[in-house]
Amino acid sequence: MAARGGAERAAGAGDGRRGQRRHLRPGRVLAALRGPAAPGAGGARAALAAALLWATWALLLAAPAAGRPATTPPAPPPEEAASPAPPASPSPPGPDGDDAASPDNSTDVRAALRLAQAAGENSRFFVCPPPSGATVVRLAPARPCPEYGLGRNYTEGIGVIYKENIAPYTFKAIIYYKNVIVTTTWAGSTYAAITNQYTDRVPVGMGEITDLVDKKWRCLSKAEYLRSGRKVVAFDRDDDPWEAPLKPARLSAPGVRGWHTTDDVYTALGSAGLYRTGTSVNCIVEEVEARSVYPYDSFALSTGDIIYMSPFYGLREGAHREHTSYSPERFQQIEGYYKRDMATGRRLKEPVSRNFLRTQHVTVAWDWVPKRKNVCSLAKWREADEMLRDESRGNFRFTARSLSATFVSDSHTFALQNVPLSDCVIEEAEAAVERVYRERYNGTHVLSGSLETYLARGGFVVAFRPMLSNELAKLYLQELARSNGTLEGLFAAAAPKPGPRRARRPRRLRPAPGRGQRARRRRHAGGRVTTVSLAEFAALQFTHDHTRTSEHHVHRLASPWCLLQNKERALWAEAAKLNPSAAASAALDRRAAARMLGDAMAVTYCHELGEGRCSSRTRMRAPGGVCYSRRGSFFGNESEPVEGQLGEDNELLPGRELVEPCTANHKRYFRFGADYVYYENYAYVRRVPLAELEVISTFVDLNLTVLEDREFLPLEVYTRAELADTGLLDYSEIQRRNQLHELRFYDIDRVVKTDGNMAIMRGLANFFQGLGAVGQAVGTVVLGAAGAALSTVSGIASFIANPFGALATGLLVLAGLVAAFLAYRYISRLRSNPMKALYPITTRALKDDPGRNRPGEEEEEFDAAKLEQAREMIKYMSLVSAVERQEHKAKKSNKAARLLATRLTQLALRRRAPPEYQQLPMADVGGA
C-alpha cells in the first residue's frame, strides 16, 4: 500500500509513470487538504502482497480477543529484540514540579502555551482498507454565485438642512392713544356715590403726533373722537386744553415701556342731591411688540389689538400691493422721518421710512422695511459637516452620521425660486458651507460644483455642496489630462468654474418619476414648503440604511466567497489526482482512503484502532543497503501482530514498501499517538511532546463585525419655545400687559379725600366770577366770611370726631339732661305750692309753731279778704325776689342782656298800682 509521505516504495516492474507521479508530490496544496492517503496502483506482486496483508488484518480484527490481555504492545521480531532499547524521553515538567519555581518564567509561559495548543490534537490510530470501488463519488460542479453590484454612486459633501419657518416676524411698534375716563357721581348729604363710569381709547391725530408728541414730547389734554356716531370733545379735569408733558410710566419691566401725561382719574362731586360728571384725559405712548405670521397680511400688537394690514405695506418698491383693510385716508407713510428716542426723549439722527395708521382706538407707527429682505419662509435647522449622498431606486439619500438621520429626496434638484420668500436659503447655506470648509476641509478636500438643493420627504430642504478629496481630484485631473493630451486641458480642468468631473461608472438610466413624485412636485411648484414636527422617520431611515449597509457587507463577502469556491474546485480536482485520500478526507470531513477511477473516485472509510495495540521499531534500516522512509510498526493482537509502517497522522499502513536510499545526517520526526518520536541517522532517539514543537497555523481568522455600533441622537425639529411662539397672539404677554396697565399709568395707592365744603366754596367762587369785577370783590368778602364759618364748623366737627371730644360732649349732654330734669321738678313744685317752693324755711317755721292749735281754743275762721290780700302780697314778694336774684346774677356775670332784662322788670314793678290792702292791727299778727 502506498504511503502518504514524500518518499515512495521500491519501484516494481509494473509501476511505470504512476509511481513516478506519486513520487513527485510537492507537499500540501492547502492546509485544509491534510488527510490519509490512499494506496496507489502498484505492480501485480505488490497488489497480491497487499491483498494478503489486508486479508490477514481483517481476520485478526474479526477474531475474538476475549481472555487475551492486549494491554501491552506486541513484542518485536527476534532480530529486532537484541537491539538496544531507546533512551527514555524526558517528559515536560508539571505545573507543580520543581521547575515551576525557576526564575525563567518565559519558558513556563511558552510551555503552557504549547500544552494548550496541543490539547486539541488527535492521538488515535486509524487503519484504512484499500478502496474497492463499491463507493464511487465525484466532485460537484461549480455553482452560480449571486450577483452583487459594485455599489451606488456615493458623493461626499457638506449639507445644510432647512425646515419650515413657523416663527412669526416680530418688530417694534409705537401706539398713541388717549385714555378718556368719564365718571358720573351723585352727592348726598354726607356721602358721594359713583353711578356710572366708562372708558374710551381715542387715537391721537397724526398731526398731533408729528408736530407735538415726537417733536416736543408733549400732548394735548383734550380728545376729539366719535362716539355713537357723534363727535365728542373731552377735556382733562373739565378744564381748558393745554400741552401736558409726557412722563415715564410708574412701572418699568423688560420689554414694557410707556409714557403718559397724568396718573389721576378725575372725579367731580356736586352739591347734595345733584349729579356731576368728571372727565380725565390721559395721553399714553407705548412701545409694544408686533407679530405677524405667514402670509403676513396682518399683525397683532401685544395689547391684543389686531391690525388688518401687512407690516410691509407701503408706498414704494411695490409695497402698495400688500394687503390692507383700511381706507387710504387712515394711512400715511413719511420718508426721511426722524424718530425720537423713547428713553432719553432726544431725536435720532438716522431718518427712517415711518408708517402711521389710525385705527378705531389707537394710532400705530412702525418702521417700513422691504419684505423679501427681512422674512424667509424657511429656517436653518441643522448643519451636517459630513454628509454622504447615494443613489437608491432612482432617489437620493442624504446620510448625516452626526445626526443619525437619513433624508430621502428625488434625484432632481428642487427649484427654490418656486417657493415664496426663500431667497435667504442660498445665501445663508453658501456662507455656512464656506465656513465649514475653511474650518475642517481646507487642506484635505476641494469643493466640486455649486450648491444644490433637494426637497426631502417630510418637508425638509437639503442644501448640498459636493466635494472631493485631494487625492481623488488629482486622479481625475490626470485622467482629463491624458484624455486631452495637452496641458491646456489640465489647466482647464483645474479651473473652478466647470469643476472637476467625477470618474464614475456609467450612470444607469433613472426611472421616470412616479405618480407620488409628480404630485409632490406639483404641490411644491408654487406653494410654501410644509415641514412635519417630528423627524423620527429620518432616524428610522438611517437605521434601515445602516442595517442594509451591514447586509451589503455580508453580500460583498458572500459573492466573492462563492467565486472563490468555484475557483478552488479546480484545485480540489487536481489535489484529488495527487492525493485522492487526503482530498476525500478533507471533503468528507472523515478519515477515508480513496483512489481515482478515471474521472471518479473510489472511497472507503478508515477504522479506528484501539489504544495499546500499536508499537514501533527503533531502527529504520532495511536489508539490502536501503532504509525505510517511514518508521516501522506492529499493530493488532499480541499473538498475531501485523507488521507495517506508520503513515501520516497516525495512519497504519500494512507492509513495508516505503523505502529510500540511506543518507547521512538523517533526522526525522514522526507522529506517534499523542506525541512525536525523533529519529536520527535512522535510529530512535527520544519521544518529543507536542508542546516542544512550535505551531505554524495556516488558518486565517475572519474577524467580521456585521453590524456596527451606533448611538442615535434625539431629533427635535421644533423646540418647545418655537412651538409656543407660533401664533399671531401671545396671550400670556397680552394678559401680563393688561394687568400691568393700571400699575403703569395710574396711581392705585393714592387716596383722594372728598371735601364737600370745598365743593361749595368752589361753586360760590365760580358764581361770583361770572358777575364780573364787582362780583369778584363781593365774592371775596363773602367767601372770606363763609370760609371762617366753615372753618368753625369744621373745627367743631373735628373736635367731636376726636374720642376725647366725643366723651366730653357726652358728659355735657348728660349734665344738661339732669339740669333739665331738676328745673322741671322745681317748676312743678312752684306751680303746686308757691309758698313752700319760694319760702320753704318760713313755711317750715309756721308748721312747727308751738302756739298753733292750743288745747281749749277754737279755730278761727279764715277771712276771705285777708286771704286774698295775703296771696297778692306773696305774689309781689316772689316777683321782688326774682328781680333781686336776676339783678344779682347780672352784676356777677356782667352781661348786658341780663341787666337790660332786670331794668325792664323794675320799670314794670314801678308802674304797678299800689296794693289795695289794709293794715292789720298788731293783735292780729303776733298776739301782743
Curated annotation (Swiss-Prot):
Residues 63-803 are virion surface. Disulfide bonds join C128-C606, C145-C562, C219-C283, C376-C424, C627-C662. Glycans are attached at N105, N153, N442, N484, N637, N703. Residues 185-191, 270-277 are annotated as: Involved in fusion and/or binding to host membrane. Residues 1-25, 67-105, 495-525 are annotated as: Disordered. Pfam families: Glycoprot_B_PH1, Glycoprot_B_PH2, Glycoprotein_B. A motif (Internalization motif) lies at residues 917-920. The record marks R505, P506 as: Cleavage. The chain crosses the membrane at residues 804-824. Its main location: virion. GO terms for biological process: symbiont entry into host cell; virion attachment to host cell. Residues 825-928 are intravirion. Homotrimer; disulfide-linked. Binds to heparan sulfate proteoglycans. Interacts with gH/gL heterodimer. Belongs to the herpesviridae glycoprotein B family. This is Envelope glycoprotein B. The lineage of its organism: Viruses, Duplodnaviria, Heunggongvirae, Peploviricota, Herviviricetes.
